Amino acid sequence: MNILYGIQGTGNGHITRSRLLIPSLRKKGFNVDVLLSGRKKDEYWDMECFRPYDTKFGITFQVANGTVNKWKTIKKLKLKQFWTDLKSIDSKSYDIIITDYEPISAWAAKKNGILSIGIGHLYSFLYNVPMQNGFFLDKKIMNWFAPVDIPIGLHWHHFGQNILPPVIPQLKGKVTNEDFVVVYLPWENPNLVESVLNKISDKVFYVYGHTSEKIVRDNIIWKPSSRAGFIKDLESCNGVLCNAGFELTSECLSLNKKIMVKPVMSQVEQLANVKALDNLGLATTTNKITTAIVSDWLENNTRNSLPYFNVVDPLIDWIECCLLYTSDAADE
């Protein structure tokens, strides 16, 4: 049985989730081709578990200083390239297409009548979950971006809908609370981040991203992207300051870590995540990063957690049943 698995590459959360699902599908004996889009090939890291995989340009949002730039996003669209990439996929060689909000694979399935399954947090927004008011056009675009036949939404709460818990790794290292804070703000201006954190001189911050090598400046240690290094620090840190992405927030909550999230402004998913976190009382949220706001959060020792659920195994079993049913129906 052949599967095309599309991964939206703009956010590391999509990749983290797929690192769990794709090897599990292959262990079941399925042939899985992997397609990533949304960033340049040399900007991916720790990708061994996906090999072999292909990369395409895809569609992505342009972000500057923590805010989505809609006009720049429109200018950067390469619709001709998207159409070329779409036509290059031999969809008929696949029994099913699975996508984690990756548009090329989703539209290839739709164009060629292949059964498609969407697995990801963004598919939970097709249900009645907390969302910011307004953003009517943005919400329509979200629904159009990577359409599927069967959407499987993931969220921190079911909200009375058919929604699954987060697909996250069960981290097995020793969880401690050492005297440093992990910072992951890839969409923010690094100079602003540094100026804010430098003023909190009695705290040590491990800031991931924005550098290709380790740099120590006063109380800030800049670290290059590394999944293994990041997880090690995540397990032992005293708190996490990050954007309002779904996957990292889920990992923090599973480890009972103190967390402050700042959404990428005008990004509907992250604004919705902030609303959900506020409604559920799971994290401290802020619309801007300032020394006073971060200092107040550091003084607050409130921690919230969510239980870990093994979502991967039953989800893989369900996908296997879908494939067997599809195969039996085709043979009749």
Stretches with model-predicted labels:
Residues 8-12, 32-79:
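Conserved nucleotide-sugar phosphate-binding/catalytic loop shared by glycosyltransferases and other
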Residues 126-189, 207-210:
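A nucleotide-sugar donor-handling region in carbohydrate enzymes
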Residues 97-103, 108, 118, 233-272:
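A donor-sugar binding/catalytic signature common to diverse glycosyltransferases
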Residues 22, 167-239, 291:
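Donor-nucleotide binding loops and adjacent catalytic segments primarily
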Residues 325-331:
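Conserved small/polar residues in nucleotide/adenosyl-binding loops
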Residues 14-25:
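Short amphipathic alpha-helix
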Residues 94-139:
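Conserved nucleotide-sugar donor-interacting segment of glycosyltransferase catalytic cores
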Residues 67-96, 101-104:
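Conserved nucleotide-sugar donor-binding subdomain of glycosyltransferases
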